[in-house]
Amino acid sequence: LGSVFSMQAGKNIKASLLSDIQTENTPYPCFGGNGVRGFVAKPNASGDFPIIGRQGALCGNVRRASGDFYATEHAVIVSCFLNADIAWACLFLSALNLNQYATATAQPGLAVSKISEVLIPIPPLAEQHRIVGRFVMLEPLVTNQ
């Protein structure tokens, strides 16, 4: 993964700076180890990225963050070195079941250095778009939507 993606953990934030609801004063989603954990006044990242949860029982889960957001130390921001479709990157990273690389401790966690060593095939961009299109078409069939 490390030859295709740059992975950087976010920054610590005091719990007192988090709001449970999105307001005019706290408009930015804050990503933790299992997706959005609240909203904050100031972002620490901007763009369109896969986010990997790196701490807790659900570590290895993949979310997508778009726009301005805050990533905590329990979330890994994934940037693509190659010209990759972000939706494909999210699907692909999810399919890797990254939780299998978690440390087996009381509080499971992923080390960026460990998952960076995972070898992966990368299809051409056109194939990535085709995969995403097929997934979008089939997803409602398995989610009963």
Predicted feature locations:
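Generic hydrophobic-segment detector
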Residues: Q22-T23, P43, N99
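Residues that form generic nucleotide/phosphate-binding pockets
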Residues: V4-M7, F92, Y101
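A common structural junction motif
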Residues: L96-Q100, E139-L141
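A short beta-sheet element
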Residues: G32-S94, T103-I115
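Intrinsically disordered, low-complexity segments enriched in small/polar residues
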Residues: T26, G67-D68, N99
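Non-catalytic DNA-recognition/assembly elements of restriction-modification systems
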Residues: L1-A15, D20-N34, E117, P121-Q145
